[in-house]
C-alpha cells in the first residue's frame, strides 16, 4: 500500500510543479513585455514609411495608444 501512496504523491507533486512553473513563467513574460514592449515609436515610423505613408507624430501617438490599450485589455 505504501508504494501506491508514494506514486500518488509523486504524481501530485509533478502536477503542482507544472502548474506553478506555468504560472510563474506567465507572470514573468507579462512583466517582461510590459517593461519591453515588442514595438516602439521608431519601429512604427519605419513601418509607415515602408507602406508609403508619411508618418506624422499624431498618427504614431494614436497607434501607440491603441496598441497599449489593446495590450492592457488582454492582460
Curated annotation (Swiss-Prot):
Signal peptide: none
Location in or out of the cell: Membrane
Membrane-spanning intervals of the chain: 3-23
Keywords: Membrane, Transmembrane, Transmembrane helix
InterPro entries: UPF0154
GO cellular component: plasma membrane
Topology class, membrane: Single-pass membrane protein
Record carries keyword Cytoplasm: no
The family this protein is said to belong to: Belongs to the UPF0154 family.
Listed HAMAP family: UPF0154 (MF_00363)
Name of the protein described by the UniProt record: UPF0154 protein SERP0914
Lineage: Bacteria, Bacillati, Bacillota, Bacilli, Bacillales
Amino acid at each position: 500500500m505504501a508504494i501506491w501512496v508514494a506514486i500518488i504523491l509523486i504524481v501530485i507533486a509533478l502536477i503542482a510543479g507544472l502548474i506553478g512553473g506555468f504560472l510563474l513563467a506567465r507572470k514573468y513574460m507579462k512583466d517582461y513585455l510590459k517593461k519591453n514592449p515588442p514595438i516602439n515609436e521608431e519601429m512604427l515610423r519605419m513601418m509607415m514609411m515602408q507602406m508609403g505613408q508619411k508618418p506624422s507624430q499624431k498618427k504614431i501617438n494614436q497607434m501607440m495608444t491603441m496598441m497599449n490599450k489593446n495590450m492592457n485589455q488582454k492582460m
